[in-house]
Amino acid sequence: MMEKHFVGSEIGQLRSVMLHRPNLSLKRLTPSNCQELLFDDVLSVERAGEEHDIFANTLRQQGVEVLLLTDLLTQTLDVPDAKTWLLDTQISDYRLGPTFAADIRAWLADMSHRELARHLSGGLTYGEIPASIKNMVVDTHDINDFIMKPLPNHLFTRDTSCWIYNGVSINPMAKPARQRETNNLRAIYRWHPQFADGDFIKYFGDENINYDHATLEGGDVLVIGRGAVLIGMSERTTPQGIEFLAQALFKHRQAERVIAVELPKHRSCMHLDTVMTHIDIDAFSVYPEVVRPDVQCWTLTPDGHGGLKRTQENTLVHALEKALGIDQVRLITTGGDAFEAEREQWNDANNVLTLRPGVVVGYERNIWTNEKYDKAGITVLPIPGDELGRGRGGARCMSCPLERDGI
């Protein structure tokens, strides 16, 4: 019987996901700060919200439970220890000074939990605090400077945490613009009633410490099932992070092998799921660059002494066939000619969310790739993404599965 908070594959029946509807954080994205906050462009937040609602409703119509991050965070703040911990971690004495930080924490603590959750994701400016809070730090900042920077990348719930079989990795993020996101998830998984007493493993990242180069993001992690996990070694996920996760998976006997594939270190291949997703028992959507014969790939297995055995694979495709017990995997490549394929990969044609074998959610704008899916027997449930797509993330990026069947 399916256990709650169990993700057994990428393609089994999807039962529950966590999403984050566009909110204040994206309203604070501007041409002058979007690069620092890891966006290429600014979005029409109202339209992005409408598109996100269509995405969420598409999932609900397919029988998927949709939980919203802001709701979970608001409910987590009802737990006094969670509220204190979040205020202490998000409002640092060393960054703001002890007296100013204490005043800000006290003011935030008196807010409604809904409003506090809004600021924990959307940020806080000096112009929003009451005039009664006086400090040299205040005197030396403009009203539009941030006390807490916004977290617009919370939109991509896939990255901050990822459920793998009977547990979760709460991921240390690579970029400063995203590192505070993880604390919001740490609090939810530690104190929210839905998770606090849950029988699941925390593999990695639960402590609020400096993980240095051991970074990991969920967009690089594919739970391909049958005891295997595929992880992309990208600009965000490092060999060090992969080793920590692999050791934890093997220690808790949750996986038999971890396949690590080296990705090109550029923006369009930010995560593995921007170039590759699992869409049917034997089928993957791929941008051809990731399955070139010269792409390095390794399989990690337990060495029997708490360490890792590393085996160099000839190709990623061969490693996948061995892991899944399949004679030949089908590769459905990005559609169109070379120009159209590059454009559609940039617009997340390969970043689809599989609801069950052969049924995916993806952006309607990727007409050439969607046509190839259809010819391959894959059903695409189309959603609009003219604004959401500006964030460089598709349906998989914007969803964190909490419960999914195995294969």
Curated annotation (Swiss-Prot):
The active site is at residue 397. GO terms for molecular function: arginine deiminase activity. Its main location: cytoplasm. PANTHER family: ARGININE DEIMINASE (PTHR47271:SF2). It comes from Salmonella arizonae (strain ATCC BAA-731 / CDC346-86 / RSK2980). Its EC number is 3.5.3.6. It catalyses: L-arginine + H2O = L-citrulline + NH4(+). This is Arginine deiminase. InterPro entries: Arg_deiminase. Keywords: Arginine metabolism, Cytoplasm, Hydrolase. It is found in: Cytoplasm. Pathway: Amino-acid degradation; L-arginine degradation via ADI pathway; carbamoyl phosphate from L-arginine: step 1/2.
